[in-house]
Amino acid sequence: MNDGLDVDVLTACWARLCLVLCRPYEVNGRLVCIADGIKAPKEGRRMPGVKSLHQESSGNTKPEFIMGHSLQAMSILVHAGVAGVAAIPLISRIHEGLVLSNRDTKTLLDKLVALVLWLASCWDRKVLLVADAYYASGKVIVPLLGQGHHLLTRLKSNAVAYQCAAQPDKRTRGRPAVYGQKVALKDLAKEGGAFASAASPVYGEQGVSVRYRAVQLLWRPVGRVVRFCIVHHPKRGTIFLLSTDLTLEPLEMLKLYGYRFKIELGFRQAVHVIGAYAYHFWMAQMTPVRRGDGDQYLHRKSDSYRDGVRRKLGAYHAHVQLGCIAQGLLQYLAIEHTAAVWRNFGSWLRTMNLSMPPSELVVASALRSTLWELLAVPSLAPDLAKILLKYRRCDPPPETEQVRA
C-alpha cells in the first residue's frame, strides 16, 4: 500500500464533503447516521483478517458458515427529492479477524462507537445513530450519551425495564432505591387500551394502519430513563424500539427505524455494482489459514510480519473506502442531476420512473455512455483522460448486458 494515501484523512474529507454536496436529514438538530455490519466472503488462505463467519439467515445461496471479512459500516441520511431520503455510505472497516495484541479487549461494539465518535468530531456535530438490536447495549449508549449523541435501536421481545422507585417522605439509612417495579415490555404490549392508531409512517407503506404506545422507563444497562415505543404492525408483528432521546415522538421513531433498511440496500449496490468488496490482495509471507479458523493472533509474530499485516489491512480499507466514495458520488449525481442521468442512460429498464432518482447501476451506465465526450476534449482534464485511456475496458461490463436483457 502506498504510504502517500492516508485512509483516515481521505475518509474525513469525504465525510465533510457529503455535508456540502447533499442536504443532510436532521432530527432535533442532529445528523442521522445508520450503522450495520456486512460479511464479505473471501476464500484466500493468505489474506489477513479472513476467518470463519456465521450468517444468521440461511438458504441455498447463503450458507450458514463462510470464510471472509467482517466489516462494520456507517451511512448518513440525506434528502433525495421526490425519493424521500437516501443513505450515503461514509465508512466501512474490518473489525474482526485480527488480534494484534493479547491486551486488546475491544469488542465490535467498542469499535463501532469509536467510528461514530470520530465521524462526529470530523463534522463537529451531534449525531443520532440508528442501528439494529445487536447494538442495543450499554457499551454503545453510555459513550454516545457522554458526548451528547443519541441512539435509536430495536429491542428483543424479552426486554425488561423498571419504573422509578418511589422516594420515601423521610430519609432512611442506606442508599435510596433507584429501580422500582420490574416491567416486561411484552406485558405492556398486551394492554390494548393504552395504544393509539395512526397511518404507518414507514417509507413505502401506504394504506397501512399501526397501533403504537410510548413509555419512559429506567433501563438497567444504562442506568437512566429511556423512551420505549411498542408498535403493533399488521404484517410485521410487534416491534419494540428504544430511543435515548426522550423528545422523539413514537411515529418519528418508527419512521427513522424504517430508514435503516437503506444501508442494506446500499450494501447490495456496493457488492453487485460498485465492487467495493471485490478486493483480492494477499500476503505472500503470511501463514496460511484453514477453513474454519477463527481470529489470527499476531502478538507472537515478528514486527516485520505485523507491519506487513497492517499494510495489507490498509490496502483493504483503502479499496473499500474508495468504493464508498464512488458509490456516494453516483448517488449524488442521481439525486442532483436526475434528468441528465436518465437522458444519457441509453438503455431500457422494465420499471423506469423518470421523475425518481435512478439507481447506481443506471448512473454508472450513463457515465460510460458519455465517456467519449470527455475524451474528445482532452484539454478539459488531461490527466484524467490519460488515466481513462490507459485503463479503459475494451469489453462491455457484464451488468450492461444484464440491463439490456
Predicted ranges, named:
Residues 2-85, 93, 200:
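Active-site-proximal, Lys/Arg-enriched surface segment
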Residues 14, 29, 46, 83-405:
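Single, function-defining residue in the core of a domain
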